[in-house]
A protein has these predicted regions:
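Small/polar loops that bind or transfer phosphate-bearing groups
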Residues: 43, 241, 265
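Short glycine-enriched loop/turn motifs at secondary-structure junctions
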Residues: 8-10, 35, 124
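Short beta-strand-loop/turn "lid" adjacent to the catalytic site in phosphate-handling enzymes
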Residues: 1-17, 40-43, 48-53
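A conserved helix-loop-beta module that forms one wall/lid of the active-site cleft
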Residues: 28-46
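Active-site core segments that coordinate phosphate-bearing ligands/cofactors
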Residues: 2-3, 15-25, 29-32, 53-236, ...
Length: 324
């Protein structure tokens, strides 16, 4: 077969030079790795060739099937499938979240390194300048534990439960290492609150509010950091992936960041994969036209900021708690 290394995946190895578009020979030498251990780079939209005859089902009489490289890193495909325009930040929201923006060139400065932002490659050698953060893992672990305690929280009831809950002036650093592993999540939350001298929630509804507001405020911190690093303001935040169905988190995020939040496609990764093929075959002339088609053909919701003054005060307290 044709063994190649697709660019968006290669860029996540920390061994790929995103400026020279090849593996970093100096880094490889420092690891005593010959460049020859890595196959030739293939770019999204390029062809691996055609399926061999033995791969077809018996009796197949159709045309030979061409195998194209897509953005094989799922977030790269998801970002391509994001129907955003102008200066926007994206949040690929799943078990974990990735928040960033698109750049034409990598940003390889000390400030980016200290902030732990990475330059990963997207379609057309664009740069996905982003940082990983907590996603739906934390809230799902809390829900799972309440279910084990005989207090299940159906997804359909989450908004109702949060609306019914009392406000809580406590906050979590959702990226604290204590929240990274599964199991006993309620106890981990309680221990964190004890350690930071904060009030614990009184019931499952308040736990939901606590986690969601902490995630939203964490996104604000990331967006503010991103804006400083790239030296421009983000007009909006576009959330793609399964996590964008969390309407409470979407609204809390709009409140926290004081700008519009827009939901993009839930299946952005699949759409991005398809767009590579459409562009390759001339259905769309470029990324701009492809994204316009996504915008026209998928449904989205917009969330406008509410209670901004209240959320600004929450953010001040949040920053004091997490000490960042």
């Amino acid at each position: 077969g044709s063994i190649r290394m697709e660019e968006t995946n290669a860029s996540t190895t920390s061994l790929y030079d995103s400026r020279k578009k090849k593996m970093d020979e100096e880094l490889l030498a420092s690891l005593s790795l010959p460049a020859s251990v890595f196959p030739e780079i293939i770019y999204p939209g390029e062809s691996y060739g055609y399926l061999r005859k033995e791969a077809y089902p018996d009796g197949y009489k159709g045309k030979p099937v061409e195998v194209l490289a897509c953005c094989s890193h799922d977030t790269a495909s998801a970002v391509l499938g994001t129907d955003g325009f102008g200066q926007f930040a994206y949040l690929s929201s799943g078990t974990w979240s990735l928040l960033g923006t698109e750049l034409k060139e990598p940003l390889l400065d000390e400030a980016s390194r200290n902030a732990n932002f990475t330059n990963e490659i997207g379609y057309g050698s664009s740069v996905r300048y982003l940082k990983n953060t907590m996603g739906m893992f934390l809230i799902n672990e809390v829900r799972k534990e309440f279910a084990n305690k005989g207090k299940p929280i159906p997804v359909s009831k989450i908004k109702e439960y949060v609306d019914e809950s009392e406000d809580i002036d406590s906050y979590l650093d959702v990226d604290d290492p204590c929240f990274e592993t599964p199991g006993e999540m309620i106890e981990k939350v309680d221990r964190y609150l004890e350690r930071t001298g904060q009030m614990k929630p009184t019931d499952e509804k308040q736990y939901l509010r606590l986690v969601y507001q902490s995630m939203a405020l964490s996104y604000r911190l990331l967006i503010e950091t991103l804006e400083k690093l790239v030296s421009h303001r983000m007009d909006s935040l576009i959330i793609v992936g399964g996590g964008n169905q969390a309407v409470v988190l979407n609204q809390f995020t709009a409140n926290a960041i004081n700008r519009k939040v827009v939901t993009g496609p839930v299946e952005a990764t699949v759409i991005g994969n398809s767009l590579v093929q459409f562009i390759r075959h001339g259905v769309f002339k470029d990324v701009k036209e492809a994204r316009e088609a996504v915008y026209r053909s998928t449904s989205s919701l917009s969330y406008l900021p509410l209670d901004v003054d209240i959320w600004n005060k929450k953010y001040e307290k949040f920053r004091k708690v997490i000490k960042r």
